[in-house]
């Protein structure tokens, strides 16, 4: 594997010296690159007929180069993407094919496909009150002051809103979901279950009966990470494409949310499709990341129009691990959060992965209650939030998520 990886870097250096290197993005960052695997973005507005012609050309070029090499060392196109006007594809290509892709007039840019990972550290209201809620985050987001464990929320509780969980899958049989969780797509393996636990935990925080914020919303699993909490960025792109298509076909746009408690190293493509998803009518809550640094190129935290969430701990301090900076929209509880785990269990874990679901859940509640559009929802949440976060970090908001309960 090391030899293959070094060879791919040599190929990149050779290509960059003799082609339009401006189309090659992110190759200088060697972290988590999958050898000979690429994400290819096509130029904005490419007509469907030209897209189909291009894909046939790619197939022909790959087949010809495999024949010249005396056999298949790469597999060609794996996924195609059409996401609210953004078109592209991913696959495994040799150096000769990559050279032809770079020089093709329809190609906008090419990024290496990478293994990305979850963003956790461990394994006039009709109000209702959940007394002594089992997760401190629920009490915190429903009170201006931080001294209550009761969760106070509007009785609509996200009813009529569909949430897409881009994660490790969901244990849909867990009693916390009351039958409101279902499977949508699996783009990483052939095991339709949550072998890690992260996706069940985040989904429980969003919609769970006991541990959740929006207790009447529905949630759909789009599995992009395996039992190790890892998967290629192309799997994430394919899942987002599926979610946008599903929302559009089922009239969920305008009343849909998506949670991305993950961090990738392919910012251009992932950011582009996340922005397209918001424009299509889906609210996106995303984790800021856990490196205790300013959000810059982390994706999807740096994408336009998403709602990027930092994490706090008890006492309204920024969690020591949480990223910060001007791209953070607001903070939410993210340290030592208790929620459902697979096989009927519960788990307590930390990360901005745990903060984003609180925002996704409150977002679903506000969408159902006020009819705020997904494109304007993050601004509404910032308007409701209160300035409680201590030491939020340089050039960072001190706004803490609040559901507007009046408490």
UniProtKB/Swiss-Prot annotation:
Belongs to the peptidase S8 family. This is Subtilisin-like protease CPC735_024010. Residues 22-119 form a propeptide. CDD domains: Peptidases_S8_PCSK9_ProteinaseK_like (cd04077). Glycans are attached at residues 251, 259, 395, 403. Residues 388-407 are annotated as: Disordered. Keywords: Glycoprotein, Hydrolase, Protease, Secreted, Serine protease, Signal, Virulence, Zymogen. One of its GO terms (cellular component) is extracellular region. Secreted subtilisin-like serine protease with keratinolytic activity that contributes to pathogenicity. Residues 37-118 form the Inhibitor I9 domain. It is an enzyme of class 3 (hydrolase). Residues 1-21 form the signal peptide. It comes from the Eukaryota. Its EC number is 3.4.21.-. The active site is at residues 167, 198, 353. GO terms for biological process: proteolysis. Residues 135-407 form the Peptidase S8 domain. It is found in: Secreted. One of its GO terms (molecular function) is serine-type endopeptidase activity. Pfam families: Inhibitor_I9 (PF05922), Peptidase_S8 (PF00082).
């Amino acid at each position: 594997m090391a030899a293959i990886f070094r060879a791919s870097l040599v190929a990149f250096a050779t290509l960059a010296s003799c082609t339009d290197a401006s189309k090659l993005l992110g190759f200088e960052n060697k972290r988590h690159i999958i050898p000979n695997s690429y994400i290819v973005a096509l130029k904005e507005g490419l007509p469907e007929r030209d897209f189909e012609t291009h894909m046939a050309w790619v197939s022909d070029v790959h087949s010809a180069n495999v024949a010249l090499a005396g056999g298949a060392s790469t597999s060609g196109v794996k996924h195609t993407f059409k996401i609210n006007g953004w078109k592209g594809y991913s696959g495994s290509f040799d150096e000769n094919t990559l050279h032809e892709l770079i020089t093709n007039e329809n190609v906008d840019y090419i990024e290496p496909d990478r293994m990305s990972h979850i963003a956790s550290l461990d394994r006039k209201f009709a109000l209702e009150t959940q007394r002594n809620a089992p997760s401190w985050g629920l009490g915190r987001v429903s009170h201006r002051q931080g001294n209550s464990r009761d969760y106070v929320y509007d009785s609509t509780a996200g009813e009529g809103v569909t949430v897409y969980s881009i994660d490790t899958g969901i244990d849909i049989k867990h009693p916390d979901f009351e039958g409101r969780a279902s499977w949508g797509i699996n783009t990483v393996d052939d095991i339709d279950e949550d072998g890690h636990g992260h996706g069940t935990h985040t989904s429980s925080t969003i919609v769970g009966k006991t541990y959740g914020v929006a207790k009447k919303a529905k949630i759909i699993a789009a599995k992009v990470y395996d039992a190790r909490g890892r998967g290629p960025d192309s799997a994430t792109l394919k899942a987002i494409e599926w979610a946008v298509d599903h929302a559009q076909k089922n009239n969920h746009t305008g009343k849909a949310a998506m949670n991305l408690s993950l961090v990738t190293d392919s910012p251009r493509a992932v950011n582009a499709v996340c922005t397209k998803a918001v424009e299509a009518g889906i609210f996106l809550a995303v984790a800021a990341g856990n490196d205790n640094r300013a959000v810059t190129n982390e994706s999807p935290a740096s994408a336009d129009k998403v709602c990027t969430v930092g994490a706090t701990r008890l006492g309204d301090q920024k969690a020591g691990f949480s990223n910060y900076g001007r791209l953070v929209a607001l903070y939410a509880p993210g340290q030592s959060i208790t929620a459902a785990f697979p096989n009927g269990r519960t788990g307590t874990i930390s990360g901005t992965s745990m903060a984003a679901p609180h925002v996704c859940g409150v977002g679903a509640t506000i969408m159902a209650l006020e009819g705020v559009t997904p494109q304007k929802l993050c601004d509404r949440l910032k308007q409701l939030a209160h300035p409680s976060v201590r030491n939020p970090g340089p050039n960072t908001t001190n706004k803490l998520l609040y559901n507007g309960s009046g408490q």
